[in-house]
């Protein structure tokens, strides 16, 4: 039985005051929930998050990472640095990183490897644009993104990783993939991994990300191959985020 995971991606939002209030509400609300819950704040707030959440049921992580371990890479953050702030998870390959900052499949797979090398859990984000979906390329695009990582690190590495399917056309748009649409892609991701190792595939948690709200979370999370959610905007509102977490149970 795969344990559900709900992870909040704060993106470039927050302040010390806002974060403290949000975290205290979430911390109080998830203490009795059987699913795993995590938050991914901007880098500068990791120390604050660690201070507030240490000893709680909540995990935390980062939104990106450098593929390098150290060196003259101005503005970059190494996975080993994230480990020192108590991070458990690191997002790699989020669609905004791919689209806005030119992260290729090669770069994403290198980041995935760097995260695992540091002892952290990568959350590999995959997904198609609207144009790719409308041209029937969803399965091809997602398979390519997944294969780039599998080709670099091997299928065994997926036993200590998470995958998040995020249809780009549904992120921040208010448009959500239907439960059936999401399930179809999640099942295809699991089948792709199963071609290499059935046991790893059966244990792999695959999250859905793309305009998840309290109103649609339960139906999405009720699908056979959807193991939780990667939550954007709703993760910034305690009541909404907690409602989504409850829907995962």
From Swiss-Prot:
Broad class of the protein's primary localization: cytoplasm
Any one GO MF annotation of this record: triose-phosphate isomerase activity
Assembly mode: Homodimer.
Native organism: Dechloromonas aromatica (strain RCB)
Function statement: Involved in the gluconeogenesis. Catalyzes stereospecifically the conversion of dihydroxyacetone phosphate (DHAP) to D-glyceraldehyde-3-phosphate (G3P).
InterPro entries: Aldolase_TIM (IPR013785), TIM_sf (IPR035990), TrioseP_Isoase_bac/euk (IPR022896), Triosephosphate_isomerase (IPR000652), Triosephosphate_isomerase_AS (IPR020861)
Residues bound to substrate: 9-11, 172, 211, 232-233
Family from the record: Belongs to the triosephosphate isomerase family.
UniProt-listed PANTHER family: TRIOSEPHOSPHATE ISOMERASE
Name assigned to this protein: Triosephosphate isomerase
Pathway: Carbohydrate biosynthesis; gluconeogenesis; Carbohydrate degradation; glycolysis; D-glyceraldehyde 3-phosphate from glycerone phosphate: step 1/1
A GO BP annotation: glycolytic process
NCBIfam families xrefs: tim
EC number: 5.3.1.1
TM stretches of this protein: none
Cellular-component GO terms for this entry: cytosol
CDD domains (UniProt xref): TIM (cd00311)
Keyword line: Cytoplasm, Gluconeogenesis, Glycolysis, Isomerase
Pfam families per UniProt: TIM (PF00121)
